[in-house]
């Protein structure tokens, strides 16, 4: 699919959509009253802004394309990444958010700095920056660049630059509030487009019953046998929690909207709303891939499942809208990541280490410079990723997360739940533990790829094993460390009893999720 396949109406919709986005960005920037809104939106975000922002950051074009591909090849089992997540979003709401908001922090490295000291904060700040550059910016730009390259037939570096310029505009012009407001607009369109695609596909295939008969029975099973090569149940049960804790509870890009919550209740309800939105991931993003298998079983490249459905089922004009929405979702992810990158570097490195008396104007200017520098570095990494051949997009994404997650998950969990954890243990986990985890990941993905060396366990089991090793190391070091210090952040003082409405909302979500898992049991 190239640009010459787009009708005049498609082009009109694309242009109109981006004009609307620019208007929203300008409006949000004019509403900004002080520089701090660049980072935490003046701590004024409501629950719906938080929910849409977290979901929008999570669901980019890369995940749309990859999820449809996973649905085409394995069914809804990949939906565990969406539905199992509610457990860890709940953990964010009731365990992490009260401490984050009570401490009035700007970044997560700042929180760990109060727990373990300045050395840990410095290490974690650099760790977070590297994580954002690789897992959020480069991988997202790579997947989005594939889409743009297919449509406009331009090189990857040009695709990445175009998308970065648009994303950087919202990050620098309106700060997090611009991203939050555009997320609401984008996600409503995303729901509409994806729901329309699913309904149109179900209509053409002959309904739900016809679809169920057209694909293998195990396509409706959330848990597969442990000898399944793609998604065995044990790695999902043991390995995903490591990624879940890191991704939903400790990743700056995901947690940033919660840090900007008006109060704890808004933050907890925003996280709950994210959990409800995650239910939509399966019918909106995975189900189209299953429908594509029923309608076009001869499709050779599963990564083309989503756009195959779009080009075959949607009329002229709708194709342009789909491209606009996918690009908008990419802008949401990249914009949030650029904002998080700027926040961490500026507040945790520049102000803390180099310019503690910097003015607000200087802080904002530094944030803009960091945003541009991060954008350029991410383009270079994207080009490097583009040179890698033969790797499945969905598995690459989940594998990278699986190898990044163990050190961070261990440090945050032990830092909160075990007071005897020492600074030395945390620092060793973040340095040696990270090097060990990343080293195993490089061996698994590139040096001795699992597709050729079948002795490797599933990458999610590797994530679990790495977490166990790092955790054991932290326990051992903490017990042997004679320089044990008291926690500098009094956890009890930052706790607040959840509102009844929050408890009710989470109870209802839990009941629904249990029901979904009981229903999709493969029978």
Spans of model-derived segments:
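Membrane-embedded helix-loop-helix hairpins and adjacent transmembrane boundary segments
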Residues: 1-523
């Amino acid at each position: 699919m190239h640009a010459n396949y787009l009708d005049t109406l498609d082009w009109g919709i694309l242009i109109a959509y981006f004009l609307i986005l620019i208007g929203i960005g300008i409006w949000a920037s004019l509403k900004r009253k002080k520089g701090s809104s660049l980072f935490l939106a003046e701590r004024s975000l409501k629950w719906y802004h938080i929910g849409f922002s977290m979901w929008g950051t999570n669901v980019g074009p890369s995940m749309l394309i990859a999820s449809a591909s996973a649905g085409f090849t394995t069914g809804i089992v990949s939906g565990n990444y969406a539905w199992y997540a509610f457990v860890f979003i709940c953990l964010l709401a009731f365990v992490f958010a009260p401490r984050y908001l009570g401490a009035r922090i700007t970044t997560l490295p700042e929180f760990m700095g109060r727990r373990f000291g300045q050395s840990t904060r410095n290490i974690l700040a650099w760790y977070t920056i590297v994580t954002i550059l690789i897992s959020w910016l480069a991988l997202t730009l790579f997947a989005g660049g594939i889409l743009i390259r297919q449509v406009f037939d331009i090189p990857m570096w040009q695709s990445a630059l175009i998308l970065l310029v648009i994303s950087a505009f919202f990050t620098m012009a309106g700060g997090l509030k611009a991203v939050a407001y555009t997320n609401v607009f984008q996600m409503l369109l995303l729901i509409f487009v994806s729901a329309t695609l699913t309904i149109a596909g179900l209509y053409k295939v002959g309904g739900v019953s016809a679809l169920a008969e057209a694909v293998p029975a195990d396509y409706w099973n959330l848990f597969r046998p442990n000898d399944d090569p793609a998604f065995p149940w044990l790695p999902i049960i043991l390995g995903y929690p490591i990624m879940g804790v890191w991704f939903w509870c400790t990743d700056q890009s995901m947690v940033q909207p919660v840090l900007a919550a008006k109060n704890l209740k808004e933050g907890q309800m925003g996280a709950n709303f994210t959990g409800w939105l995650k239910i939509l991931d399966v019918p909106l993003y995975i189900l189209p891939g299953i429908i594509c298998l029923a309608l076009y079983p001869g499709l050779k490249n599963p990564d083309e499942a989503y756009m195959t459905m779009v080009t075959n089922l949607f009329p002229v004009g709708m194709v342009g809208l789909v491209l606009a929405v996918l690009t908008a979702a990419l802008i949401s992810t990249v914009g949030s990541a650029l904002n998080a990158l700027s926040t961490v570097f500026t507040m945790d490195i520049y102000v803390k280490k180099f310019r503690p008396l910097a003015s607000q104007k200087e802080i904002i200017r530094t944030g803009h410079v960091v945003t541009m520098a991060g954008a350029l570095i991410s383009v270079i990494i994207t080009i490097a990723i583009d040179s890698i051949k033969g790797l499945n997009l969905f598995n690459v994404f989940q594998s990278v997360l699986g190898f990044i997650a163990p050190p961070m998950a261990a440090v945050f969990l032990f830092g909160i739940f075990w007071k005897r954890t020492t600074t030395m243990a945390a620092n060793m986990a973040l340095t040696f533990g990270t090097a060990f985890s990343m080293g195993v990941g490089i061996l698994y993905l590139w040096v001795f790829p699992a597709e050729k060396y079948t002795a490797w366990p599933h990458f999610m089991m590797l994530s679990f094993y790495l977490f166990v090793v790092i955790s054991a190391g932290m326990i051992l070091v903490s017990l042997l460390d004679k320089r044990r210090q008291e926690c500098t952040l009094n956890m009890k003082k930052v706790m607040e009893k959840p509102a009844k409405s929050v408890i009710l909302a989470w109870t209802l979500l839990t009941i629904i999720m249990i029901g979904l898992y009981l229903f999709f049991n493969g029978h």
